[in-house]
Swiss-Prot record:
Keywords: Activator, Nucleus, Transcription, Transcription regulation. PANTHER family: MEDIATOR OF RNA POLYMERASE II TRANSCRIPTION SUBUNIT 5. Component of the Mediator complex, which is composed of at least 21 subunits that form three structurally distinct submodules. The Mediator head module contains MED6, MED8, MED11, SRB4/MED17, SRB5/MED18, ROX3/MED19, SRB2/MED20 and SRB6/MED22, the middle module contains MED1, MED4, NUT1/MED5, MED7, CSE2/MED9, NUT2/MED10, SRB7/MED21 and SOH1/MED31, and the tail module contains MED2, PGD1/MED3, RGR1/MED14, GAL11/MED15 and SIN4/MED16. The head and the middle modules interact directly with RNA polymerase II, whereas the elongated tail module interacts with gene-specific regulatory proteins. Residues 998-1070 are annotated as: Disordered. It is found in: Nucleus. This is Mediator of RNA polymerase II transcription subunit 5. GO terms for molecular function: transcription coregulator activity. It comes from the Eukaryota. The keyword Nucleus applies.
């Protein structure tokens, strides 16, 4: 028996494949025989348990040497025995043997819970080198703790957590563990810590270092698990003499959200370069509401940049305060408090958004950013609450109850006016009862569907005279569709549902059904996408995009065309919602790869083969639909093809068809080349000339196109050939060379065939500039009618192929707004009406169908950033001129006044920008980033030097001025940067002080000679008086009024439509793929970071040459360093 060991026993049991319970029984018998004295002592201890208190008291009173010696001997004997057994366990774990060996150890240690043995065994785990068995041991242990229900064992585990289990696990060598082991250890710690009812205090520095190492390793491999584990650590682990993981937003625990009327004390951000005594000065900024501003800008940027679905969104939001403020906080904000704060902040920011829209940007239509906000609040917030809260209903109700009344009023009035079609000239203080609902109720409905709130709660947030029948509200997140019999069915398998729906979907029907009563399930879901529960929306998005990627890999052209078409039309804002749940750049990358890398596949195909012809049509349509979707993503959502190509190395810029195509959308060359990259090849030029001649002959002479002609040209070549032909024909008609329009109509009708539809894309963009020129030229009425007649062949065909119907509607939508603008100019005024209102207008009989068609296609599905009067019924007596631009920035105010309003907002440290961010971004593009930056800097310098900071007791203090620049540079950084990766690259770029020659710097040398008065200083003769804080709607949120409406009248003949650009398609020049060193500077070529850094390098050169003074250089370096400091501290 002396030679036997637990090690040998375990091996024999494993060979016989005994269960862990059977091993446990044999182990107990072995231990009884191996260490009989310990068993006897244990039994004796058990029989005397009732007298343990008396014995303990006696031992305390009489501490004899004999007693001490006996106790020490027993303890030593026990430790020796346990050490022998635990050493055998370690030997077992180091074997390359069956996994059941680890089960045996878990059974002995945990199932038959032995605190002394665990304390002896865990420190030895560092000597285990077999990661497979070790991982299995930890996994089984995790499973045991997760299922543990025995209260006696739970009590003992809780006692051992702080001094045995957690310290020993955190003391393991985390650096030597692989990814799988790191994840398993993290899950084990997360599971065991959940058993602790209160935080555990750890005093060992090794534990602290181990936790940081573990989280660091985990963050690189599993971000979702990292978020959960870090949240558990924040709540359950405290280290001696260290700050908690998550800091609360303020020293006052009740300041969890922006207060609108009476903001509590919020510490001011302090730069690391400020003097130590500046902390006392921070108390003077009680009314600056800086924290509200930082959260407002951060949330808006996350929503604008499609970052709201990131798994680390909540943890990043929680880190805003600690990243900006250097104050130390002692209290920990748990997840419920954090979510309450996020809910309040979101509604406050949304109220500020709609208020800016109503009172500062009354001539703009900000529907895209507004829709993004609505999706975030009604879909993403409920998901965050579902996955991170304790499920307590009070998390939401507390937040909704704490929202300031002015926020509620602003939201309510906005939605009431939106529903009732009121004008902004009515009484702003009118607060009459209305039955309209607002975004708060849509938010609550989403929570009800996820069982996070009872249905009855919605009535608590209605007016006293309102009531909703809660029985009709859905209380489950099931996805319903209506079958052919009209019966609703529940969708159980989303993936198979989408695939089957796509296979049965008829593409031509998606734009024909006005009532949207199609029996196709996917069509129904997308047309009612706003009413789908957030969980199902996310599930649909994931499955939909996965199916799309598979279709592209498998070259399932029919499915590709259908998916692109459904996404393009954005039914019920489905595409916008899909982009909010996914990565728009990833979708764009997939589309670019498909368009650029896929081959045409039509060359040499047999035109007589019916299946081959069907496949040829599918190939051509899938290619054409993909181009339409790319243009839509670029034009509507601002996703740049060049930026995406720069981001992904597998995409080419130089030889990209789609980048070149989009860059030249409105331009049709006077010469046609089959291969534009090889224009000097004489053979290619001859072939191109012959191709054009053959097509013109077949279209307008022979009256039919031969199969050989179609088979010998690729779809991408047709995309440029057909616009070229249309241009030559229309120009010939305009100058009177072609007069027989009837002979041309037949040829134009061919352009509507499925294989040739791709040519209409460029055609409709070019038509805008062509019609503008025609309007400005003096041509006869007959020629004008002939042009309109030809255009009606393309706009309103008498017959249209079934495969062409949906695409025809889609391609008309792309450039419909600019075309409507120019076509309406051809209308003739029938009466003057003294110029009071826009009077009745009449157009050519061939003109009105063109306008009506464009209005009709725009009403098929949502359009963004468009004056709703453009696409609604004709309003002959509209008080305001129709605005066709995205933002009519100069229609009501001159640029000086607009800039002054915004600069005053920066200067006064308001809790939001004066104008909404999307409007501001357009403004920056209009005036150029360079002018915006230096105008704001020079004006702020002047205002701070002359007036100081409004609302500050120490108005002229240098620290006060620092806060204003911190405020402004925070805006600049978040304007430039979308992700932490971009921030890291920009930091590396800006910290590179290598000298450049003047030729290498983008900024012109003469800019150095600008004096302080070269940029117009936006100033008033005197600072404006403070606005009273109880004014409900002059700056709704208790800030000073920065409006400059009292300025002297500007000249009325200024350019009032500076933003009515012909189209929104950027002109991009394809370049060589950039090297790694300058990639970020090209990707961020329009950023303030590149502007500041290039100017800094140029200033350094100028200082060496004596062109500027050292003081001027140091002043600019301080701005460069402030941007860099903010770049390092901001949360992305």
């Amino acid at each position: 028996m002396e030679k036997e060991s637990v090690y040998n026993l375990a091996l024999k049991c494993a060979e016989r494949q005994l269960t862990s319970m059977e091993f446990s029984n044999l182990y107990k018998e072995f231990f009884n025989e191996k260490f009989p004295s310990l068993i006897q002592e244990e039994e004796e201890d058990t029989t005397t348990t009732a007298n343990i208190n008396e014995v303990k008291k006696a031992s305390d009173l009489v501490d004899t040497p004999s007693n001490n010696t006996a106790a020490t001997a027993d303890t030593t004997h026990l430790h020796e025995a346990l050490d022998i057994v635990c050493s055998d366990f370690v030997k077992i774990l180091n074997l390359e043997k069956p996994l059941i060996l680890a089960d045996y150890i878990v059974e002995v240690l945990l199932v038959n819970y032995n605190s002394d043995m665990i304390k002896c065994f865990l420190p030895k785990l560092n000597s285990v080198r077999n990661s497979l068995l070790l991982a299995h041991f930890f996994s089984k242990s995790c499973s045991f703790f997760a299922k543990l229900s025995d209260t006696l064992i739970i009590d003992q585990v809780r006692k051992d957590l702080g001094n045995v289990i957690v310290p020993n696990i955190l003391s393991l060598d985390m650096n030597s563990m692989n990814k799988e082991l790191i994840a398993i250890v993290s899950k084990l710690l997360q599971t065991t810590l959940k058993l602790s009812p209160s935080p555990i205090l750890l005093t060992s520095a090794g534990c602290k270092n181990g936790s940081f190492t573990l989280l660091n390793q985990l963050s690189q491999t599993n971000k979702l698990l990292f978020k959960r584990v870090s949240q558990t650590f924040e709540a359950k682990l405290h280290f001696k003499d260290t700050k908690p993981f998550l800091n609360k937003d303020s020293t006052n625990e009740f300041v969890g959200s922006p207060s609108l009327t009476s903001p509590q004390y919020i510490p001011s951000p302090l730069s690391s370069t400020k003097p130590p005594g500046s902390v006392n000065s921070a108390a003077k900024y009680k009314d600056m509401k800086l924290l509200r501003y930082y959260k407002n800008i951060w949330l808006n940027n996350k929503i604008i940049n499609w970052e709201i679905s990131n798994p680390d969104f909540l943890s990043k939001y929680s880190a805003i305060t600690s990243s900006i403020f250097q104050e130390s906080f002692n209290s920990v904000q748990n997840l419920d408090q954090l979510l309450t704060d996020l809910i309040e902040t979101s509604f406050t920011c949304f109220a500020q958004f709609v208020s800016n829209k109503q009172y500062h940007q009354a001539n703009s239509n900000l529907t895209l950013l507004e829709r993004k906000w609505v999706i975030f609040i009604t879909k993403h917030l409920p998901l965050l609450i579902l996955e991170n809260s304790s499920r307590s209903p009070r998390v939401v109700t507390n937040a909704l109850d704490n929202i300031d009344e002015k926020v509620v009023k602003a939201i309510r009035i906005y939605f009431t006016e939106k529903d009732d079609n009121k004008t902004n000239n009515e009484d702003l203080f009118d607060d009459y009862p209305s039955t309209s609902l607002d975004i708060r109720h849509d938010f609550i409905k989403g929570l009800i569907m996820l069982n996070l709130q009872p249905a009855s709660v919605i009535n608590n947030y209605l007016r006293e005279d309102q009531m909703i029948d809660t029985s009709i509200l859905p209380t489950r997140d099931d996805l319903f569709v209506r079958n052919l019999q009209g019966i609703q069915e529940v969708v159980h398998n989303t993936n198979s549902f989408i695939i089957s729906s796509l296979d049965t979907l008829e593409l031509e029907s998606i734009t024909e059904s006005i009532t949207h009563d199609s029996s196709n399930g996917l069509f129904q879901v997308l047309h009612n996408f706003e009413s789908v529960a957030p969980t199902k929306q996310r599930e649909i998005v994931k499955a939909f995009l996965s199916i799309f990627e598979d279709a592209i890999k498998e070259l399932n052209y029919n499915r590709i065309a259908k998916i692109c078409a459904l996404l393009f039309f954005n039914f019920s804002h489905s595409l916008t919602t899909i982009l909010s749940f996914s990565s728009p750049a990833a979708l764009m990358k997939t589309l670019i790869k498909f368009v650029d890398l896929s081959r045409n596949g039509r060359n040499g195909s047999n035109g007589n083969d019916e299946s081959s012809e069907y496949e040829t049509i599918n190939i051509s349509l899938s290619f054409s639909w993909a181009i339409l979707l790319i243009i839509n993503l670029t034009q509507t959502y601002g996703i740049s093809v060049v930026d995406v190509a720069l981001k992904y190395p597998e995409l080419s810029i130089k030889n990209s068809f789609i980048i070149n195509f989009i860059s030249n959308l409105p331009n049709v060359s006077d010469k046609y080349y089959l291969e534009e990259s090889n224009v000097n090849d004489s053979d290619m030029l001859t072939k191109s000339h012959n191709t054009v001649q053959s097509w013109l002959c077949d279209l307008f002479v022979n009256g039919s196109i031969t199969d050989q002609l179609i088979q010998n040209i690729e779809t991408r070549q047709l995309a440029n050939l057909i616009p070229f032909i249309v241009k030559q024909v229309l120009l010939s008609v305009e100058i009177g060379v072609l007069t027989d329009i009837s002979s041309l109509i037949g040829g134009f009708e061919y352009f509507l065939q499925p294989l040739l539809l791709v040519g209409l894309i460029k055609t409709f963009y070019w038509l805008e500039q062509f019609l503008s020129c025609v309007k400005n030229d003096t041509i006869s009425e007959d020629i004008l009618q002939g042009i309109f007649n030809l255009l009606n062949t393309l706009f309103n065909p008498v017959t249209l192929n079934e495969d062409s119907k949906a695409f025809h509607t889609a391609v008309l939508r792309l450039n419909a707004i600019p075309l409507l603008k120019v076509l309406r100019k051809f209308r003739v005024q029938s009466q003057s009406n003294y110029g009071i209102y826009s009077s009745d207008a009449q157009g050519d009989p061939n003109l009105e169908p063109l306008i009506a068609k464009l209005v009709a296609v725009l009403n098929v599905s949502p359009v963004y950033d468009v004056d709703p009067r453009i696409i609604n019924s004709e309003n002959d007596y509209s008080r305001k001129q129709l605005g066709y631009g995205k933002f009519l920035i100069l229609n009501e105010n001159p640029i000086n006044k607009i800039m002054t309003n915004q600069i005053n907002s920066f200067w006064s440290l308001h809790s939001s920008t004066y104008y909404n961010l999307d409007y501001l971004f357009e403004l920056i593009e209009l005036v150029t980033p360079k002018s915006f930056l230096f105008d704001v800097l020079k004006t702020l310098e002047y205002k701070l030097a002359t007036y100081g900071v409004p609302g500050s007791e120490n108005k002229r203090g240098s620290l006060d001025s620092e806060h204003v620049f911190d405020y402004f540079f925070y805006f600049l950084v978040l304007y430039d940067v979308k992700t932490a990766e971009e921030a890291s690259q920009l930091i590396e770029y800006m910290e590179n002080d290598a000298k450049k020659s003047k030729g290498d710097v983008d900024i012109k040398g003469e800019d150095l000679h600008e004096k302080n008065d070269s940029a117009e200083v936006r100033q008033e003769t005197q600072p404006k008086a403070e606005a009273t804080q109880d004014d409900d709607f002059d700056m709704l949120f208790g800030e000073n009024d920065t409006s400059t409406q009292a300025y002297e009248e500007e000249e009325e003949n200024e350019d009032n439509d500076g933003n009515n650009r012909t189209n929104n398609v950027p002109m991009i020049k394809a370049e060589e793929t950039p090297s790694k060193t300058n990639k970020i500077s090209i990707l961020k070529r329009h950023s303030f970071a590149v502007l500041l850094h290039e100017r800094k390098l140029l200033n350094d050169l100028a200082l060496e040459n004596g062109e500027i003074t050292k003081t001027e250089n140091e002043k600019f370096i301080s701005y460069h360093d402030k941007y860099l400091c903010m770049l390092k501290t901001c949360v992305f």
